[in-house]
Amino acid sequence: MNTVFEIVSQARRKNKLKRELLDNEKKVRDNRKRVELLENLLDYIKPNMSQDEIMTIIKNMKADYEDRVDDHIIKSAEISKARRDISRRIRELTEEDKQASGKK
């Protein structure tokens, strides 16, 4: 019976991670769009149009968004790995439960 509870618990955790993964992928998309926006902005701003400080600020903002994208990609990989581990554990528990039930 404990196996059933663990299977349910693991399945719920897996579903939670799936939702978190989808949310994280949305953040990756959003930040990629911001990076593209800032790249376009850098194409339009010329040194004779504005101060060099503005260029520096925009470049820093772009780098920050790129870092965020990288962080979200890493987090997605970690979440995916956790989900795979949970799926593997659920399969193992299910198999153990089947074997235990078959022996009775």
UniProtKB/Swiss-Prot annotation:
One of its GO terms (cellular component) is cytosol. It is found in: Cytoplasm. Residues 13-43, 76-96 form a coiled coil. Keywords: Coiled coil, Cytoplasm. Pfam families: DUF496. It comes from the Bacteria. Pole-localizer protein involved in the regulation of several cellular processes. Belongs to the pole-localizer TmaR family. This is Pole-localizer protein TmaR. It comes from Vibrio vulnificus (strain YJ016).
